[in-house]
Amino acid sequence: MMEKNTMLFSLKDVGKEYQGPAEKIIIFSRLNLDIAQGDSVAVVGASGSGKSTLLHLLGTLDNPSRGTVLFRGRDITAMTAEQKAAMRSRDVGFVFQFHHLLPEFNTQENVAMQAVIAGMPRREAMKKAAHALELVGMSGRAGHRVGTLSGGERQRAAIARAILMHPAVLLADEPTGNLDERTGDSVGQLLMDLNRELGMTLVVVTHNNSLASLMNRRLELRAGELYDQNC
């Protein structure tokens, strides 16, 4: 169990813009945000408002145009590419709308694969994968090929892969977007269970109001500004 209520992320005057064909496209200009260890945060807003961009900044998949992003007090915008990769491997789990599981491998092998590629002995990675699958209620499907799994089971397997190394934060981009309502509700509840049981910080980009309502914080990105709807 991770210690809660310590600051995990602090964004200070963060701006992000891209150069368009004729002019700069401003995604957001000055975001300030604190996320504590153990928080569960929904990020909502219209398409194109910058929700996924914010998630990418937290996960070191992109850099801000200005400002600082602190992780446990350390400025991750100043990290080298190697340091960012190490942070992602150790501290960050990602879940996306599409699971990107490989059909030629079974469920447990898919969950273990990233750790094996990173250098973990296969036996150790498979043991960790078995435990992760147990946490998401998928022990009985460990030896099954991915093609035999339902949509909800595949997303659960993707979540198991994301939590394999017990990261400090799970970043999920539309994790229920490709699922029917009932299955999406089940996956949403699983994410909240992991947040509570493991103390894992959860940041979810979603258009699903049912999923957003489960979180203890709801942030809206609108016209380049961030609004905390719990304030």
From Swiss-Prot:
It comes from Oleidesulfovibrio alaskensis (strain ATCC BAA-1058 / DSM 17464 / G20) (Desulfovibrio alaskensis). One of its GO terms (cellular component) is plasma membrane. Its EC number is 7.6.2.-. It is an enzyme of class 7 (translocase). Keywords: ATP-binding, Cell inner membrane, Cell membrane, Membrane, Nucleotide-binding, Translocase, Transport. Belongs to the ABC transporter superfamily. Lipoprotein translocase (TC 3.A.1.125) family. Signal peptide: none annotated. GO terms for molecular function: ATP binding; ATP hydrolysis activity; transmembrane transporter activity. Residues 9-230 form the ABC transporter domain. PANTHER family: IMPORT ATP-BINDING PROTEIN, LIPOPROTEIN-RELEASING SYSTEM ATP-BINDING PROTEIN LOLD. It is found in: Cell inner membrane. ATP binds at residues 45-52. It is a peripheral membrane protein. This is Lipoprotein-releasing system ATP-binding protein LolD.
